Each structure stands twice: as C-alpha cells, then as structure tokens.
C-alpha cells in the first residue's frame, strides 16, 4: 500500500513512491498506488481536501479515494458508479472514483472492466 506525502511537503511523495516501488520489486510484491491517486487528486481537483487538519492523515474523502484504489487494484474493476459512498457528496464521489480508476489503469497499464 503506497502511502501519500504530507499536504505541506510536496516533494515527499516522489521519495515515498521511489522507495515503495524499490521494496516491492525486491520482494515481488503488489503495490496499491494510493499515494499516486492522492498526487493526481491534489493536482486535478485541489478543491477536494484529501487530508485532515494535520495535513498528514486522510480526510473522509481521502479515505474514500484510497479505498477506491484498493478495490480497483484488487478486482481490476472500475469503481465509477459504486453506490457505497458514505457521507461523501455524490458529485465528489464520482470525481474520486474517476481519479482512482485513472490511477490504477495507468499505474498497471490495464483497462478496468
């Protein structure tokens, strides 16, 4: 599970990504690219706050995004339109699902079902 960098430390993510990929390659492990999704989400939808007030831990939206990435990675299926969105606004949920799907598709170079 590739984590994300802190909100106020923009260069942290690239270092984390490098080390997660190195460790996974050395040990033949699957990487769930949650950090990659956070990076894309922060760049493409900065209006969606993925962090709690400590700028480190995920907000409800960040948790939803990470869970969507886990689902798409493990099942190879799109998350778009999944109805289990909890307290997240539907318009925000669809954006986060699209971020998760795009991240997983590009990270693994696959087409989600």
Identify the meaning behind each predicted range:
Residues 102-113:
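Long, charge-rich low-complexity segments
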Residues 1-9:
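Surface-exposed cleft-lining segments at the edges of enzyme active sites
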Residues 10-103:
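Catalytic His-Asp segment of secreted/periplasmic serine-dependent ester chemistry enzymes
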């Amino acid at each position: 599970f590739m984590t994300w960098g802190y909100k106020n430390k923009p260069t942290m993510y690239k270092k984390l990504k490098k080390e997660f990929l190195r460790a996974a390659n050395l040990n033949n492990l699957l990487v769930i690219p949650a950090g990659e999704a956070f990076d894309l989400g922060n760049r493409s939808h900065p209006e969606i706050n993925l962090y709690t007030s400590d700028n480190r831990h995920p907000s409800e939206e960040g948790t939803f995004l990470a869970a969507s990435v886990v689902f798409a990675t493990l099942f190879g299926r799109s998350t778009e339109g999944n109805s289990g969105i909890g307290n997240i606004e539907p318009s925000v949920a669809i954006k986060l699902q699209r971020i998760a799907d795009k991240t997983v598709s590009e990270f693994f170079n696959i087409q989600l079902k």
